[in-house]
Amino acid sequence: MIEPDLETVEPDLAPVGPDLEIEVEQRLLAVFDFDGTITRHDSFVPFLKFAFGQRAFSVRMARLVLPSLGYLAKRLTRDELKGRLIKAFLSGVEVQWLQQKAEAFCQSHWKRLMRPAALESIAAEIEKGAIVTLCSASPAMVLQPFADRLKVQLIGTNLEVIDGKLTGLIEGSNCRCDSKVARLESVYGPLSQFRVRAWGDTRGDHELLAAAQDAHWRLFHPTWRRGRYKGPVNAKLHNPDGNDGPTR
């Protein structure tokens, strides 16, 4: 067999360089925040109201008035307030009961909760062959039916379980800010091996957006509600002004 003379090979037939090989081999990882990004509003508090009923919900929420005031006065952090919320509602709750309520909530609230444009975007990412995952601060148990229906992966805040019952405590950390990136890497490995596309809408998504090659800020919101992105300046946003502008 005659070996080709690489110096005379036409440019379009020349061997692929190392940099191009890396780009070709990179898989797409599409990461969507859940609450407010692909939904019209927060889902966890409405879920609690749905699961427990109006009366029990109101009684438990009344216990959170003082902690909420403490949060507003900056004596409690956001994560601490969320911990109080979870403890007030979910201590001693059976996992099976919560899972059944989550499934029923997904079925009854899907149309009123989900943003149609976001559903189209998720379907498009799946069609491209991307690994698609929801990455949310909401409890994973509550969001699992939504992930199953979307046919995507899920990373969420884990709840501690002992003997089939919730303890009312978070297992690990609340999945927001730096924890989103850490959790993604714990599941998928270094993000540098992927071309990461990310969608978010709050302060809790800034680190995720900064870790992505393609970042989208409140893309599915009505234009008048998007506002200007105020996160890390190194985020490669397509719409830093809340509009579909060029990547910066």
Which functions belong to the PLM regions below?
Residues 17-74:
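Active-site neighborhood of HAD-like aspartate-dependent phosphohydrolases
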Residues 81-116:
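Metal-dependent phosphoesterase signature
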Residues 50-53, 104, 214:
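Residues within well-ordered alpha-helical secondary structure of globular protein domains
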Residues 69-95, 147-150, 154-158:
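Short, compositionally biased "basic patch" segments
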Residues 38, 55, 76, 92, ...:
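Residues at alpha-helix boundaries and short interhelical turns
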Residues 44-45, 82, 181:
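A general structural signal for well-ordered alpha-helical segments in protein cores
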Residues 1-15, 19, 26-27, 100, ...:
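C-terminal cap/substrate-recognition subdomain and adjoining C-terminal extension
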Residues 42, 93, 179:
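Conserved active-site and cofactor/substrate-binding residues in soluble primary-metabolism enzymes
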